[in-house]
From Swiss-Prot:
GO cellular component, one term: cytosol
InterPro entries for the chain: DNA/RNA_pol_sf, DNA_pol_Y-fam_lit_finger_sf, DNA_pol_Y-fam_little_finger, DNA_polymerase-Y, DNApol_IV, Rev_trsase/Diguanyl_cyclase, UmuC
Active site: E102
Keyword Ribosomal protein: no
Species this chain originates from: Mesorhizobium japonicum (strain LMG 29417 / CECT 9101 / MAFF 303099)
Major site of localization recorded for this protein: cytoplasm
UniProt subcellular location: Cytoplasm
Residue positions binding Mg(2+): D11, D101
Cofactors (names): Mg(2+)
Coiled-coil spans in chain: none
Entry's cofactor comment: Binds 2 magnesium ions per subunit.
Keywords: Cytoplasm, DNA damage, DNA repair, DNA replication, DNA-binding, DNA-directed DNA polymerase, Magnesium, Metal-binding, Mutator protein, Nucleotidyltransferase, Transferase
Name listed for the protein in its UniProt record: DNA polymerase IV 2
Length: 415
């Protein structure tokens, strides 16, 4: 680990809402939400009333009757997000962009040019505000995890530097919800055994965390609670997974909602896998319920897949398993699919026709090859005539369209 804090995490504050207030100054100081049927993003003024991203529009209006909904200016989001990252690039070549509105930067190699990390972070914030008119919060620390937490503590529109020697004092008084990987469901499970702060988590025996969260998550959180994070910045990341999600508002957990939504998600994910000739072996689904708690489930296959209907069916099995384990949950607010363990191969290994029950889900079987061929035909039509030229009937007729496709594409774009 470095002996000085040189890793920055820069995060544009309430980015989509801030852009809307920049484009229309009459919205400044007012509670606004980007979206309609589902809140895609909320300004800090709206968050003060409890409005959050992913929330149904109706509930958001109940919490904040004066809430102003705006449709979204997606080209401006991309332009301004790129411009903010360019400011970081002007100070250091070691930049890892992790989303449209946030990035890590390591300034260890440029302090002789621009001053100490605190000075560099201050200069970045001033330039983003002066050149783009947007607020940005920055955290500075020795590790990526701590820098990201520091930027959250700095919000809105602030700067927090965590110097070596003060790290655990800073970290251990903070709530566990600030940690990477702790969502509402994990936070709730930790609270059940009396863990509210990162310090309480750090002092919990690793065996208890493993039993509660599983070996991977338990060991990871235990290490992060002690600021043990050896990860380096990845400036030229190659995608290790592909995913898509759909915020549904509040929908009944029934087949007529789940099946078309999963097919729509599978279409978005699988088409990207085929375009990169990178099928994957591990399929993961995420189901978020009405109370915003979420459950994930995954399966690792014998062969990598990139066929749309095959992915949708496997995801459907996983989602049904989640719902079977949570029979009291009758409403879902989000579904997500991701494929990981990607491989560098466009070719399919042929299977012998053994009449196996899962033959249609085996990529190299006769039925599997037919499915892949149909997908490639769809890909070629879309390449020539556009994405809307052809699709799956179930998706076209039934899939919820509460989130604009432009927003989905922006969120899923490989940066």
């Amino acid at each position: 680990m470095e002996t000085t804090a040189t890793i920055l995490h820069a995060d544009l504050d309430a980015f989509y809402a801030s852009v809307e207030q920049l484009l229309d100054p009459s919205l400044r100081g007012k509670p606004i939400a980007v979206g309609g049927g589902v809140v895609l993003a909320a300004s800090y003024e709206a968050r003060a009333f409890g409005v959050r991203g992913g929330m149904p529009g109706r509930k958001a209006r109940e919490l904040c009757p004066q809430l102003i909904f705006v449709g979204g200016n997606f080209s401006h989001y991309q332009r301004l997000g790129d411009a903010a990252i360019k400011v970081l690039d002007d100070f250091t070549p070691v930049v890892e962009r992790i989303s449209i509105d946030e990035a890590f930067a390591d300034v260890a190699g440029c302090t002789h040019l621009f001053g100490q990390p605190r000075d560099i972070a201050t200069a970045i914030r001033h330039r983003v505000r002066a050149e783009l008119g947007l607020p940005i919060s920055i955290g500075v620390a020795r590790t990526k995890h701590l820098a990201k937490i520091a930027s959250q503590v700095a919000k809105p529109d602030g700067l927090v530097v965590v110097d070596p020697g003060t790290e655990l004092d800073f970290l251990h008084d903070l709530p566990v919800s600030l940690m990477w990987g702790v969502g509402p469901a994990t936070k709730s499970r930790l609270a059940e055994i009396g863990i509210q702060t990162i310090g309480e988590l750090a002092r919990t025996h690793s065996g208890a965390l493993t039993r509660l969260l599983g070996p991977a998550a338990g060991e990871k959180l235990a290490a992060l609670a002690w600021n043990r994070d050896p990860r380096k910045l990845e400036t030229r990341r190659r995608a290790h997974s592909a995913g898509a999600q759909s915020a549904l508002g509040q929908k009944p957990a029934v087949a007529r909602v789940i099946v078309p939504t999963l097919l729509h998600l599978a279409d978005r994910v699988a088409s990207r896998l085929r375009a990169k000739a990178r099928p994957g072996r591990t399929v993961t689904v995420r189901v978020r319920f009405a109370d915003l708690s979420a459950v994930t489930r995954s399966i690792t296959l014998d062969q990598p897949i990139s066929a749309t209907t095959m992915l949708a069916e496997i995801a459907g099995d996983l989602v049904r398993g989640v719902l079977a384990d949570h029979p009291r949950e009758k409403t879902i607010s989000l579904l997500a699919i991701s494929v990981s363990h990607l491989e560098e191969s466009a070719e399919l290994q042929l299977d012998l026709p053994l009449g196996l029950a899962d033959e249609k889900r085996r990529p190299g079987s006769k039925k599997g090859l037919a499915r892949f061929g149909a997908d490639r035909a769809i890909d070629k039509i879309r390449e020539r005539f556009g994405k809307q030229a052809v699709g799956y009937g179930t998706v076209a007729l039934e899939a919820a369209r509460s989130v604009p496709d432009e927003f989905r594409e922006l969120a899923e774009k490989e940066l």
